[in-house]
Swiss-Prot record:
Pathway: Porphyrin-containing compound metabolism; protoporphyrin-IX biosynthesis; 5-aminolevulinate from L-glutamyl-tRNA(Glu): step 2/2. Its cofactor is pyridoxal 5'-phosphate. One of its GO terms (cellular component) is cytoplasm. This is Glutamate-1-semialdehyde 2,1-aminomutase. Homodimer. It catalyses: (S)-4-amino-5-oxopentanoate = 5-aminolevulinate.
Amino acid sequence: MDDLASAETLDAVSDETPNSARLFADASTVIPGGVNSPVRAFAAVGGVPRFVRSGAGCWLTDVDDNRYVDLVCSWGPLILGHAHPAVVEAVQRAAKDGLSYGAPVEGEIELAREIIDRVQPVEKVRLVNSGTEATMSAVRLARGFTGRPKIVKFAGCYHGHADALLADAGSGLATFGLPSSPGVTGASAADTIVLPYNDIGAVAQVFAEQGDHIAAVITEAAAGNMGTVAPGPDFNAGLRRITENHGALLIMDEVMTGFRVSRSGWYGIDQVAGDLVTFGKVMSGGMPAAAFGGRADIMDRLAPLGPVYQAGTLSGNPVAVAAGLASLRAADAKAYETLDRNADALIALLTASLDAEGVAHHIGRAGNMFSVFFGTEPVRDFQSAKATETWRYPAFFHGLLSRGVYPPASAFETWFVSTALDDEAFDRIADALPAAARAAAAAEEN
């Protein structure tokens, strides 16, 4: 049994989760760390991850029959909540006809058109299977289109686990305190330039020095993997100006923000168009699917039209396409109003409870995405995010989880709401928060 599933950790599990403890111990004998994505291991907060039996609306039920208000939403995709009838029906209908063909299906065209209709600068779309594939492919395409080798990214922004993009990344790397990953060679990272987020001056300087060698800047349209950190008022627009002036491309990573913060994603908020845009999460309807798209002249460099190769056996999978299309079509204007209203209400409850206990904090927010930063200083980049009082978060997390509220298991992850949050859910949250806030106030730095 490895460190993540140590006897000490298992002993910390309450009597209410024996089945999760048993399954986690069992999983750790056949799956590294007992999980298939690191943040699920609860390593940053302690305890044993809850093994989920089912989800319905805004509620999760674990294998011990405990119910939780879900404020993770599968890390973002489930804006409509779990098992939304329209999505389930679409998946069942598609699955009845066949699970995979390795051939084109009509639904691919419909999903691509839905994305293009929502994000007007996107003229063509290629479907893939994950956000990592989308960003990895967009970077390769940018290099192939420009003939240049270097990519600029920002510290704390996570663009999937492709080697070239793991330098100083957020998400799990931030959670585990890793600057990069063993196995990423110097050659893989040599053409990646990492700059501070929200520092347009640093971008201007590096382009002045190396602009002829830079293929693209890739940025999260609004950062959600160092906690939630919105771009400064002129940051994205500044990136647009600088890349245009130097003949480089701007890759907007909307895997997290796309179709969540508005019908058109972050583009619908700041109107800054990427030459290439990556999508995932919401457009998948909860299935393994993602996409990247952009200007037609760039996208047409992809095989089979052009020389930049990208392929995938399961890309455009008919069941995943059906789920994504149903999810997007159900996400109408009313849905986005509900998401914003639910985020407002939840943030108000969080703020009131923490204020009542005198816990210094800031809410980082980008549309209806947000996170809680403990401490007195505002957060605008990865350095300031790492300087917060993250040691308060485990106590706060377990104060909520033990009372039936499921927040993200890391201080560096974003909280997500769904349209399915109801009065019962908000009552549960309101009841749980005072004790969780007291736990955060009483926490001591190790």
